[in-house]
């Protein structure tokens, strides 16, 4: 029987790892970084809407920036994908994961007083 080659990025095992890491990043950012979700942008959109309706402008900023950073992360991943030539040594997915790791490693050193920056960068990494 002939075995069909499967893209590693489409494996169930990697899907489980990504779901777990996304959940961890949400738990970390919500519990440790001022009640903002890193990965669950629907939750941030809900909290953003509530903050707008209450005219609580500091909270609007707190939820808006991570949502925009997540969108920027998606655009950055697309930019990497489109700019990468197939003949390069690294695949665009590998470069994207490397960018995520660099950003998340940097977030570890951001103090709690800069939660808006930390949450925005974490959301950027989740968007990649």
Predicted regions and their residues:
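Alpha-helical transmembrane segments of multi-pass membrane proteins
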Residues: 2-128
């Amino acid at each position: 029987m002939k075995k069909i080659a499967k893209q590693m990025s489409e494996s169930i095992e990697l899907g489980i790892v990504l779901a777990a890491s996304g959940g961890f990043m949400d738990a970390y950012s919500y519990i440790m970084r001022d009640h903002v979700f890193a990965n669950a942008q629907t939750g941030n959109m809900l909290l953003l809407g509530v903050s707008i309706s209450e005219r609580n402008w500091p909270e609007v900023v707190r939820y808006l920036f991570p949502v925009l950073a997540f969108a920027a992360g998606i655009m950055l991943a697309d930019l990497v994908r489109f700019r990468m030539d197939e003949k390069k040594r690294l695949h665009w997915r590998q470069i994207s994961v490397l960018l995520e790791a660099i950003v998340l490693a940097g977030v570890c050193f951001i103090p709690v007083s800069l939660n808006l920056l930390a949450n925005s960068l974490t959301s950027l990494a989740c968007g990649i």
